[in-house]
Amino acid sequence: MNQNHTILQNLPVGQKVGIAFSGGLDTSAALLWMKLKGALPYAYTANLGQPDEDDYNAIPKKAMEYGAENARLIDCRAQLAHEGIAAIQCGAFHVSTGGIAYFNTTPLGRAVTGTMLVSAMKEDDVNIWGDGSTYKGNDIERFYRYGLLTNPALKIYKPWLDQQFIDELGGRHEMSEFLIANGFNYKMSVEKAYSTDSNMLGATHEAKDLEFLNSGIKIVKPIMGVAFWDENVEIEPEEVSVRFEEGVPVALNGKEYADPVELFLEANRIGGRHGLGMSDQIENRIIEAKSRGIYEAPGMALFHIAYERLVTGIHNEDTIEQYRINGLRLGRLLYQGRWFDSQALMLRETAQRWVAKAVTGEVTLELRRGNDYSILNTESPNLTYQPERLSMEKVEGAAFTPLDRIGQLTMRNLDITDTRAKLGIYSQSGLLSLGEGSVLPQLGNKQ
């Protein structure tokens, strides 16, 4: 593969060009422009269960009206649910503020979209792909990686990297006028104070007014839940139970779901009634510049809370520590568009095999407003939490006796003695100032 020619800077006239088509202004104008300039556009739309999309079937029809040679709707929901569950099992979330995580819902969506749309293009012998991602964002690299992983012969053509397209249709007003001039009665939607991208797992709100840190979450109108910060919004406390079998969520409130898509939709409805899973994050983009986003993920948050409760009740401390360390690393790889790279697969396999397989049980929670909740009950046949081991009451057949603890504490003398010696060395070298005003207590002599 010749990297110098992977990215095409000019429209490939007379050739098939696949475009990830959303039906919005940008992709509509781009498709028509490519058609009029002599390319053969093929439109591919991913059904990701976007909560703000009313009629998926209308999108390919619209693409045909704008001049697509063919237009296909690709149902990506089952695969997206599968990847979302995998992320929950692995704790693949590296961005958090105050203990509230961003659930990497956009990166998960890009992993599914990038592979499934390019796979559909291969079926149609379309080997040139364009999408609406900008050069400043993460998606341009994510789609690049997933596209080439799926089709190594793929060429990339992005209208927003083509100077001719930018010169002719560089803004929303110009694109709207272009469509009208060509006989399409396109009416621009009223611009919001921010942009939104969503799929079944979550929604991302960013850019425009949200680029300013003095614009808070209150300017956002949630699309997956309620504005829990608004005192006029009535939110009643609600009990909900979540059941897992071998790391897979299978039931909500006692009702089993064979279809993971329906399971996620119901989890979104439950969590959304409370605004669960909304967060405000500052993160590092792939190119190391910081960006800010407001995120929604009610179902992911609900599953994550219940899953981690079971993890902490079932696994030992060292396993939990490794699960968290690996999850942070895996979350970053997912964010970077490396969800299917070997290093990510290695981390995923470790968590799914050795952590998730033991996670069977049910957690009952009370949801209130936003991320305010209480855990009411935890049940699992695999719990290693056994209260009688540490009961403050007198119990028959105690796991250990006072004499056992005396022996255990006596063994600690070895490392305590070594630690005292090290502190003395640090003091002599000037690294520590021992005595009055020191952060350490007075140790006396070194013996």
UniProtKB/Swiss-Prot annotation:
Domain of life: Bacteria
Coiled-coil parts of chain: none
Molecular function per GO: argininosuccinate synthase activity; ATP binding; protein homodimerization activity
Catalytic activity: L-citrulline + L-aspartate + ATP = 2-(N(omega)-L-arginino)succinate + AMP + diphosphate + H(+)
Gene3D superfamilies, A to Z: 1.10.287.400, Argininosuccinate synthetase, chain A, domain 2, HUPs
Pathway listed: Amino-acid biosynthesis; L-arginine biosynthesis; L-arginine from L-ornithine and carbamoyl phosphate: step 2/3
Binding site for ATP: A20, F21, S22, G23, G24, L25, D26, T27, S28, A46, G132, T134, D139, D197
A family per Pfam: Arginosuc_syn_C
Keywords: Amino-acid biosynthesis, Arginine biosynthesis, ATP-binding, Cytoplasm, Ligase, Nucleotide-binding
Annotated GO biological process: argininosuccinate metabolic process; L-arginine biosynthetic process; urea cycle
Subcellular localization(s) per the UniProt record: Cytoplasm
Enzyme Commission number: 6.3.4.5
CDD domains xrefs: ASS
Enzyme class, UniProt record, top EC level: ligase
Binding-site positions, L-aspartate: T134, N138, D139
Residues that bind L-citrulline: Y102, N138, R142, S195, T204, E206, E283
Main location: cytoplasm
Oligomer and partners: Homotetramer.
Sequence similarity: Belongs to the argininosuccinate synthase family. Type 2 subfamily.
Classification via HAMAP family: Arg_succ_synth_type2
Name of this chain's protein: Argininosuccinate synthase
Organism: Neisseria gonorrhoeae (strain ATCC 700825 / FA 1090)
